[in-house]
């Protein structure tokens, strides 16, 4: 029985922790970045204790709640209020089995019926199934679904829609099929799901229409640079990943340097590991990188309101810090010898949970190519 499997139990425990933690926290989603700055700084600290909890909170407040705030309009405010109180749990359904980084080619469709003021959401192919959707397998009531908007035979590109996944009894809505993605290398407390839409009907108002809408005559109307504006609003989430990755690096270095000072090896009078140049050569460059990354992250946070550079700052933070964190964790694990391999060192668990940071919210190698566009 699925509900008695260790994987399910692990997810229930994380969800209970999530609810308990948020019962002590009052967070308001707003369009200004003041509260967002506080949230990502909080995420930074929680990375030291529970990366899974950070991911689950980020899905609820950043990927779901903040996206409605940034891409929606006043008519969507009720979703934000219920997200803050956890009456609604949401998820972010962009990635598909066949497409991740290339969102322009997403295959999920949203076909507009003007006479009925409705959209029909459909995943016509296996490759169009929404996949790796955090909080989607078990808990999310709603999803922000990114789909190609069709009016008649004309495609107007990728747009975000609110689609209900489950009712109050946690039963899937009509024509919505949800599967569990199963075990992962890490973050197994987070319920990643596969979501299939078989011509699911949603009302017109479920279109997040800050940058594009359909007028009373059925004509499509969009602001100039719609897609780039939409993606820029979403890019800030990567900055939190950069901060979290770097604080993990700092933790690993602190533990390793403490060990290296106390641990003595070789010679008639044994010397601390840190006194050896070969050891310094391994650890000190990583320490220097962590300081530089920290300074850059603080700079990026202080310039969140400048959307002209935030997109690129967040890319630099995520890529530099996530890659450096994995390098640091591995070097620190080896630098602590067998003790670094012990479960209580936390190095191994952190590595497994952080590994995906180089991929989700944008593959690092692909993201770096966007830096060339910065002027």
Sequence positions of predicted segments:
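A short core secondary-structure module
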Residues: 114, 118-178
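Sensory/regulatory domains in signal-transduction proteins
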Residues: 67, 94-101, 128-129, 136, ...
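Short Pro/Gly-enriched beta-strand edge/turn motifs at strand-loop
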Residues: 87-94, 175-179
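A glycine-rich, basic-preceded beta-loop-alpha segment at the flavin cofactor/substrate interface
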Residues: 133-135, 171, 194-237, 255-274
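Flexible, small-/acidic-enriched active-site or ligand-binding loops
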Residues: 173-199
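Alpha-helical interface subdomain recognition
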Residues: 1-48, 232-375
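Amphipathic, small/basic residue-rich leader segments at the start of a protein or domain
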Residues: 1-90, 100-101, 112-120, 305
């Amino acid at each position: 029985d699925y509900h008695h499997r260790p994987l399910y139990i692990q997810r229930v425990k994380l969800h209970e922790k999530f609810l308990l933690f948020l019962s002590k926290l009052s967070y308001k989603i707003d369009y200004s970045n003041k509260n967002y700055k506080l949230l990502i700084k909080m995420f930074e600290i929680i990375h030291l204790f529970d990366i899974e909890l950070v991911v689950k909170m980020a899905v609820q407040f950043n990927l779901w709640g903040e996206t409605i705030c940034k891409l929606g309009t006043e008519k969507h405010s009720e979703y934000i209020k219920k997200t803050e109180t956890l009456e609604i749990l949401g998820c972010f359904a962009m990635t598909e089995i066949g497409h991740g980084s290339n969102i322009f080619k997403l295959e999920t469709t949203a076909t507009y019926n003007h006479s009925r003021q409705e959209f029909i959401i459909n995943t016509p192919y296996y490759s169009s199934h929404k996949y790796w959707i955090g909080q989607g397998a078990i808990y999310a009531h709603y999803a922000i679904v990114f789909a190609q908007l069709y009016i008649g035979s004309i495609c107007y590109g990728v747009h975000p829609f609110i689609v209900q996944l489950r009712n109050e009894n946690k039963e899937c809505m009509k024509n919505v099929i949800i599967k569990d993605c199963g075990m992962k290398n890490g973050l197994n407390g987070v319920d990643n799901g596969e979501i299939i839409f078989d011509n699911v009907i949603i009302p017109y108002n479920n279109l997040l229409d800050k940058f594009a809408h359909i007028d009373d005559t059925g004509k499509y109307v969009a602001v100039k640079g719609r897609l780039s504006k939409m993606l820029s609003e979403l890019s800030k989430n990567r900055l939190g990943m950069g901060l979290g990755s770097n604080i993990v690096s700092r933790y690993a270095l602190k533990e390793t340097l403490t060990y290296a000072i106390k641990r003595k090896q070789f010679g008639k009078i044994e010397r601390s590991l840190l006194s050896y140049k070969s050891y310094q050569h391994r650890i000190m460059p990583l320490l220097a990188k962590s300081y530089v990354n920290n300074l850059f992250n603080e700079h990026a946070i202080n310039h969140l309101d400048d959307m002209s550079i935030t997109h690129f700052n967040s890319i630099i933070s995520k890529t530099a810090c996530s890659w450096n964190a994995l390098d640091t964790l591995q070097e620190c694990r080896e630098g602590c010898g067998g003790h670094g391999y012990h479960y209580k060192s936390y190095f191994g668990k952190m590595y497994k949970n952080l590994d995906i940071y180089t991929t989700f919210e944008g593959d690092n190698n692909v993201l770096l190519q966007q830096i060339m566009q910065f002027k």
